[in-house]
Regions:
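A structural signal for small-residue-enriched, beta-sheet-centric alpha/beta enzyme cores
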Residues: 1-88, 92, 98-404
């Protein structure tokens, strides 16, 4: 497996683009994006667990019932959520995109992100859909990634190549996500493309299994968005034998999927609103994977610990506190905690109790822009990893005037 450039355009037969259509006030910001497959593709998606769902979620769920899609369209600046005509507008987006590209509107993945509770006018979208389609190109992944950004400060794009059945395949993705990130079943907005041949059923299984260990293990602020969705299209143009069972080829595909989604998870967590550090919690020695996940997620969700990481304060007691209310079955008298970064590692807790350590060395480690909290439970062989970020003054500033 090899990391390559191209994002969602790395896979054969995929093109993408993004333009400004007028949803957002700033004319310098793209606010609508499109991804197109040359041929109909196997498709799957997972969605937010929030009971309040954006209208595009319902439309996409219906469109993907048959496991086939050929185009994805997404606007930013307006979530199209809690609007009386929301589903009608989302379906109109499908029709407009389908007409422009000559594609069945029922084969369109539609998404929106932005402010909740504001009507989304179809007029600017209708007026610019032709221009959006004209902007789609074979190297347009970056423009598409820009078009789905809201409070993001970094573009999130990744791709890999891998070999299945002797054929070189490609899998790439773009994502948006900076705030309201605390998913369950899906997260933020993620668009994945692949040229491997895989059945809709196996693609759905691969994605559903994958998000449990990747996107479901990310949290920035504890808020679960109304519009979270991860979607994938696989068009088969790599020419490999169809993956229709859990065989060796399926395992290779899943490994490539995990490589891409894990990279996107780290990008999303590192770009948390106002964040200055990527916070990763690695839990090992757990009785079960479930306990390991509960423990890791609890640690990266702790506001007190996130604030301590921002201040480069080695307050390991906040780690134990988070473990204690995590719901995981642990024996605190066996727990070890260490902090780790590019400049080194330091043990700060052994067997659930304090030990002597250099505060200066700990601070040096915690001042790096990527920090790991390593928790060893000494109770079994299961492990899990979760990703988050520190909590800074800027998070409040950004969300205090989000609508203005």
């Amino acid at each position: 497996m090899e990391h390559i450039s191209g994002g969602v355009c790395a896979a054969k037969g995929f093109q993408a683009g993004g333009i400004h259509c007028g949803i957002r006030k700033n004319r310098g910001k793209r606010d609508i994006s499109m991804i197109i497959s040359e041929v109909p593709a196997s498709a799957a998606a997972v969605y937010t667990s929030n009971l309040v769902k954006g209208a595009p979620i319902y439309v996409t769920q219906r469109n993907l019932a048959g496991g086939i899609a050929q185009l994805a369209v997404c606007n930013s600046g307006n979530a199209n959520t809690c609007n009386a005509d929301g589903e009608e507008v989302a379906w109109q987006m499908c029709e407009l995109a389908g007409k422009a590209a000559g594609i069945d509107p029922h084969h369109v993945i539609v998404a929106s992100t932005g402010v909740i509770g504001q009507p989304l006018s179809i007029e600017p979208i209708a007026q610019h859909m032709g221009a959006l389609y004209a902007a789609v190109k074979g190297n347009g992944s970056q423009e598409a990634a820009e078009g789905i950004m809201t409070t993001d400060t970094r573009l999130k794009e990744v791709a890999v190549s891998f070999v299945v059945d002797g054929k070189v395949c490609h899998l790439g993705g773009i994502a948006k996500g900076s705030g309201m990130i605390h998913p369950n079943l899906a997260t933020m907005l993620v668009f994945l493309t692949c040229d491997a041949a895989i059945s809709p059923a196996m693609l759905r299984k691969a994605l559903s299994d994958n998000v449990k260990d990747t996107f479901n293990m990310v949290s920035v602020d504890g808020d679960t968005s109304t519009n979270d969705m991860v979607s994938i299209m696989a068009n088969g143009l790599a020419g490999n034998a169809l993956i229709d069972s859990e065989n060796v080829d399926y395992a290779v595909f899943c490994a490539a999927l995990n490589e891409v989604t894990t990279a996107l998870c780290r990008m999303i967590a590192k770009d948390g609103e106002g964040a200055s550090r990527l916070l990763t919690c690695v839990v090992t020695g757990s009785k079960t994977v479930r306990d390991a996940k509960l423990a890791a997620k609890s640690v990266i969700c702790s506001s007190l610990l996130k604030a301590a990481i921002f201040g480069a304060d080695a307050n390991w007691g906040r780690v134990l506190c988070a473990l204690g209310y995590s719901g995981a079955e642990i024996d605190v008298k066996k727990v070890d905690v260490a902090f780790r970064s590019a400049v080194g590692s330091i043990d700060v807790c052994k067997n659930g109790a304090s030990i002597d350590f250099s505060e200066e060395k700990a601070k040096e480690i915690l001042l790096e822009d990527e920090v790991d909290v390593v928790v060893t439970l000494h109770d079994g062989n299961a492990s899990a990893t979760a990703w988050g970020c520190d909590l800074t003054y800027d998070y409040v500033k950004i969300n205090g005037d989000y609508r203005s």
